[in-house]
Amino acid sequence: MAKKESFFKGVKSEMEKTSWPTKEELFKYTIIVVSTVIFFLVFFYALDIGINALKQLFLG
C-alpha cells in the first residue's frame, strides 16, 4: 500500500514541476498542428493522384 501512495505522491510532485502552456500558446500550437496535418493531407492526395495518372498513362 505504501508503494502506491509513494508513487502517486511522486506523480503529483512531477506534475507540479511541469510548465503548462498558456491559452495563447495552446491555440498557436493547435493551429500549427492542424495546418501541418492539412498540408500533408493535400500533399499525399496530390501525390496519389499523380501516381494514378502515371499508372493510367503507362498501363492504359
From Swiss-Prot:
- Kindly list any coiled-coil regions of this protein: none
Annotated GO molecular function terms are: protein transmembrane transporter activity
GO annotation, cellular component aspect: plasma membrane
Q: Which Pfam families match?
A: SecE
> Membrane spanning segments where?
31-51
Biological processes, Gene Ontology terms: intracellular protein transmembrane transport; protein secretion; protein targeting; protein transport by the Sec complex
**PROSITE patterns on file:** SECE_SEC61G (PS01067)
Query: Main subcellular localization, coarse class?
Result: membrane
What does the UniProt keyword field contain? Cell membrane, Membrane, Protein transport, Translocation, Transmembrane, Transmembrane helix, Transport
Q: What membrane topology term does the record carry?
A: Single-pass membrane protein
Quaternary organization:
Component of the Sec protein translocase complex. Heterotrimer consisting of SecY, SecE and SecG subunits. The heterotrimers can form oligomers, although 1 heterotrimer is thought to be able to translocate proteins. Interacts with the ribosome. Interacts with SecDF, and other proteins may be involved. Interacts with SecA.
The protein's job, in short, is: Essential subunit of the Sec protein translocation channel SecYEG. Clamps together the 2 halves of SecY. May contact the channel plug during translocation.
Please report which protein family the annotation says this sequence is part of.
Answer: Belongs to the SecE/SEC61-gamma family.
Q: What is this protein called?
A: Protein translocase subunit SecE
Q: Which organism is it from?
A: Staphylococcus epidermidis (strain ATCC 35984 / DSM 28319 / BCRC 17069 / CCUG 31568 / BM 3577 / RP62A)
Tell me what gene encodes this: secE
